[in-house]
């Protein structure tokens, strides 16, 4: 039975305990996904490792360790990748949720988590990389916004199983792709005035 506050709202107490018990890895200084079938953590660098910051389920010390251990491996030219580069030993066919692809929901949740724990500079660096990539791709290509990007190359061009909605002319949704549109608005709102001016100059140039 869920724990509840006196006002009837669900309590996060049990959730926090579960996150700490199953997802936190003190040795590696990060949270990991947990494989319930195996009963063990997946020791793999992924954007989801930063999600406990968004949910407010970690201490300041854990947040610092997680940002230090995970963000450098995930932050690319065009924003935060879904995963770190996958080694040749475990990689199969290129999948859209793997490196080097980045998705708007990941960016938004991680920005909010970084901001929540006071990592403003890191948040703005990540948002600037993502927003700048979208602006370049939009102005240089078809004027609209696709669902995902290759953040390593900073490009809308992908070669994965389901293609890229909005990146080919016979499948361009009117008005762009919802969550990518939202990430552009939310990302711009988080930038410094200097970063916004740099993006304005970029849009005028390309």
What is each residue range found by the language model?
Residues 48-60, 107-120:
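Alpha-helical support elements that line or immediately flank enzyme active sites
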Residues 1:
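Conserved, charged catalytic cores of large soluble enzymes
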Residues 4-6, 71, 110:
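Intrinsically disordered, low-complexity segments enriched in glycine/proline and serine/threonine
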